[in-house]
């Protein structure tokens, strides 16, 4: 056996030994994963994500995927000559845009994720929040520095989640893949930020972990240093001084709310890293930023 292969084998053995306590600890638990960013668009990362999700299921963890689809929605809007607009990180969604959002998220994106997971041996099932009306939504009004309660169209916030559908899929050995579209009291569709859906679903499922995949290493301070542990108080300060803004705001808000409301560990991790999920769940060091419901920052 060549020397490099001996090293490779030794590394693999070490990794497995390090992972074993975590496999035992988390077996039988739910991990809600917000899937987005480069991990959804780069072929190698997409395939790696699917393999990692299947592995989680094989070792007894129950992954529940909530996906975004911003780049795909933008591409479709561009095709039809419609410009995307955002307010405080939320997509302005008129009726035409909502039709496109629902088509892209519930159709193309959801089915692609399901197909890829199943290709690697999983049993994924795609659902939208409108299926069985399991995600009830209400209109979201956004406050801006210039104006309070701005109406940005068919954009919603989660009013309630009936977890029966998702729990039923888990009990059947399936991997639920959730498109973040909710339903209003009149049956109308609402575009809901995927981070908000993931956080609320993690709360309602009493998840062990909420993992949010992003295109950054985690939460950074103004000098570019990674903040590995954060409390709500520290996060309030980072928002106040402008360190956190735009699209990070709903992600952070969802992570904090989930941590405060009982999700045992909430993480913002770098989805550009191969095997990011496994690195966070099964290694001593972990990656990214952990959001704590209470306690001291590290």
Curated annotation (Swiss-Prot):
Pathway assigned to this chain's UniProt record: Amino-acid biosynthesis; L-arginine biosynthesis; N(2)-acetyl-L-ornithine from L-glutamate: step 2/4
Keyword check for Amino-acid biosynthesis: yes
First-tier enzyme category under EC: transferase
Keywords: Amino-acid biosynthesis, Arginine biosynthesis, ATP-binding, Cytoplasm, Kinase, Nucleotide-binding, Transferase
Biological processes, Gene Ontology terms: arginine biosynthetic process via ornithine; L-arginine biosynthetic process
One GO molecular-function entry: acetylglutamate kinase activity
Subcellular location: Cytoplasm
Residues annotated for substrate binding in this entry: 69-70, 91, 191
Reactions catalysed, as given in the entry: N-acetyl-L-glutamate + ATP = N-acetyl-L-glutamyl 5-phosphate + ADP
EC number per UniProt: 2.7.2.8
Superkingdom as given in the UniProt entry: Bacteria
CDD domains attached to this UniProt entry: AAK_NAGK-C
Major localization class: cytoplasm
S-S bonds: none
Pfam hit, one: AA_kinase
Listed GO CC annotations: cytoplasm
UniProt site (Transition state stabilizer): 34, 251
Membership in a protein family: Belongs to the acetylglutamate kinase family. ArgB subfamily.
HAMAP family the record matches: ArgB (MF_00082)
Function: Catalyzes the ATP-dependent phosphorylation of N-acetyl-L-glutamate.
The protein's name in its UniProt record: Acetylglutamate kinase
